[in-house]
Amino acid sequence: MKASELRDKDVAGLNQELSELLKAQFGLRMQKATQQLQNTSQLKKVRRDIARVRTVLGQKGNQK
């Protein structure tokens, strides 16, 4: 997801997105641990999406 798309969302939507991404990251880590994960680049993509969401949340918090 692009940062510009995230900036259009409200704080509640961003928190929901962050929660979903964290759950996805947990699932991917479990798949990696049990050697069921085929595409390991998914971990990197999810980790960076989490960072984007947290960055936008921080920016919205500083605006107030």
Swiss-Prot record:
HAMAP family: Ribosomal_uL29
Keywords tagged on the record: Ribonucleoprotein, Ribosomal protein
GO cellular component, one term: cytosolic large ribosomal subunit
Matches recorded under Gene3D superfamilies: 1.10.287.310
Family (UniProt): Belongs to the universal ribosomal protein uL29 family.
Xref: InterPro entries: Ribosomal_protein_uL29 (IPR050063), Ribosomal_uL29 (IPR001854), Ribosomal_uL29_CS (IPR018254), Ribosomal_uL29_sf (IPR036049)
GO BP of this protein: translation
Keyword Nuclease: no
Protein name: Large ribosomal subunit protein uL29
Gene Ontology MF term list: structural constituent of ribosome
Superkingdom, natural source: Bacteria
Any matching Pfam family: Ribosomal_L29
